Amino acid sequence: MEQRISIERMEQAVNLFGSFDENVRLIESEFKVTISNREGELRVNGEVEDTMLAVKALNALLTISNRGEPITEQNVRYVISLVRAGQEDRISELTQDVICISSKGRPIKPKTIGQKKYIESVLKNTITIGVGPAGTGKTYLAVAAAVAAFRERKVNRIILTRPAVEAGERLGFLPGDLQSKVDPYLRPLYDALFDMLGAETYQKYLERGNIEVAPLAYMRGRTLDDSFIILAVEQNTSCEQMKMCLTRLGFNSKMVITGDVTQIDLPADKMSGLKQAVRVLKDVEGIGICELTDQDVVRHVMVQRIIKAYADYEAARNEKRKK
């Protein structure tokens, strides 16, 4: 069977095919078809079902190209997963969702349907708990939402914090050199802020007190009004720490809690506060629980494969335990 797709501009074809035709080769390999570009048309040949799936994938990628975005391998693999699930039409939902503009003028957008739902939860709810594997953009998108709220004067401060169990953090115990110890653990937050604001603007807001980046234990005893609070990597908080963090919320504030329950560094006899919070707060009004999956990973494709392999391994182990 042969299907044809019209290409209006040469730039579309260049973007769609990718460097050394790698994007099209990936679709050919996935759906067992051949794709050629002749006289302003894409010609797709293969078995009927395979050809129809490949055409759906190509049309979805053209939707991405038409909105002026470069087509990457990650785009192609994500579109393929949507086509396999019969959800390729949902790619158009991502076209208008600009969260904020980076310091270099780049629009920050959700790249997957899961990320879109996550951002919608952040905007709708007072507290959002985002749970998912590494590389799903949990913290980065939360920082983007915080910067957008700050620029629109919806909040006066952005507060970012994360635990540092490896640095010896305990409630009520703050070693004098804790800040220097936890700086490496706060680096992902710094990087996201630098990308959104630029180093100079970040430093200016930091000096004014509009931005605060601090270890988790510094939050104790405070009430945080008019703030956008991000608690990152919260799988490493104890249940007591999590409750302490949640009760810091003040008036006109919003809180986002992110974590990956597969990367817990707490002692074996301690329950993760994040796990408990998801169970306890799932039905509380004003709190959104958003679960991202390996399909939402926007890092190197190998990261997605590794996450899936570990998930399959854990699922197999749990199945054996049940037996």
Residue ranges and their predicted role:
Residues 41, 103-231, 235-323:
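Conserved helicase motor core of SF1/SF2 NTP-dependent helicases
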Residues 12-29:
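Short amphipathic alpha-helix segments
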Residues 36-95:
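Interdomain "pre-motor" coupling segment immediately N-terminal to P-loop NTPase/helicase cores
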Residues 85-106, 110-113:
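Conserved loop-to-helix interface motifs that mediate assembly, gating, or partner/ligand docking
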Residues 16, 23, 54-57, 242-245:
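Hydrophobic side chains in well-ordered alpha-helices
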Residues 25, 31-34, 38-40:
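Compact, well-ordered interaction domains used in eukaryotic information-processing assemblies
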Residues 1-15:
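Short glycine-/aliphatic-rich beta-strand segments at the starts of folded cytosolic domains
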